[in-house]
Amino acid sequence: MTIEQVAQRAGVSVATVSRALRGLENVADSTRARVQQAAMDLNYRPDPHAARLASGHTKTIGLAAPLVDSRYIAQIVSGAEEVLAKRGFDLFIFTTRSQRSFSSSAGNRHLLVDGMILVDVGPDFRSQFAVDTAAVTVGLQSNDLSSVSIDNGAASLHAMAHLLELGHRRIALLAGPESNHPSSAPQLRRRGYEQAMQDAGCFDAELVVDGAFTLTGAAEATRSLLALANPPTALFALSDEMAIAAISVLRESDLRVPEDVSVVGFDDLDLAEVLGLTTVRQPMRQLGAASARLLLGEIERGDGESEHQMFETNLVVRHTTAAPRSVES
């Protein structure tokens, strides 16, 4: 059944049917009752997306992220969803791992979102949507868009200071793929690592490997580090998931953590506490919630003014770090 058929049966215009079924004013009670009866007689169910579009708002927010299956992203999504649900908004998730697949998804949905949350992706992805689509970035600071982030460089320096103070000098970095955006979270963390190692006079480019922010990538990267003539005594992983993969490979290689190799992660996922992982804690759910609040505020105001929020991190020292054996002896 269509809205036109309901209008014909009730003897009113399509616009009147739309207003009556959406509960809007300027519809006589008798007319509203007639429209509702006609809709029931025809078993008509209005399309919620069409109704939303007719009002000028879809009540849908898009969230774009490179790895939608990561625990880090899941925490951000959870925080954002909680805020959005209370305001009656749905959340639609895009993956940006492939520019082609993102463009295809965005092309199908660009008219169906009121705003975008961009997690660890550059503001250029906003061009896939309508020019006036509101957007907020998470993890990547932008002058043009509102953002929520942590001080990734400082957090990385803090983690490195811990390892250096323990006496480690052969410290490897399980990084992510090179980014085109110098202000992206992985790039800022990498820069913090490089600065700490250079200041300590022990930077070695062969100790920086790409773990791809995945379990498989981190495992392969760890094996390549262990194959070096002078392997590292400590690993700093830019995510807890990569740190967990590294620990698994170390144990497979009969190396003890932290007695033989120390490991530091980044995020402080729930699993990190269970495994006793030393890691940088960042408030992932808070970042997601804050991004949703900023975005909804921008949508309501419609002024396009950007706002930036910075959240604190702290190093949680547990049981995967210790002084290297050379220092202990």
Model-inferred region functions:
Residues M1-K59, R325-E328:
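N-terminal helix-turn-helix DNA-binding module of bacterial transcription factors
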Residues S13, K59, D114, R169-I171, ...:
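Short acidic/polar active-site loop segments enriched in Thr and Asp
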Residues T16, A54-L67, H162, R170-S179:
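Short beta-strand segments enriched in small/hydrophobic residues
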Residues L24, G56, S101, F125, ...:
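Generic structural signal for helix capping and beta-alpha/helix-loop junctions
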Residues R32, V77-S78, R190:
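Short amphipathic alpha-helical segment that frequently serves as the phosphate-/nucleotide-binding helix
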Residues D41, E82-R87, T133-T137, Q141-S329:
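Bacterial carbohydrate/catabolite-sensing allosteric modules
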Residues P48, T60-A161:
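Alpha-helical recognition/docking segments in bacterial nutrient-uptake
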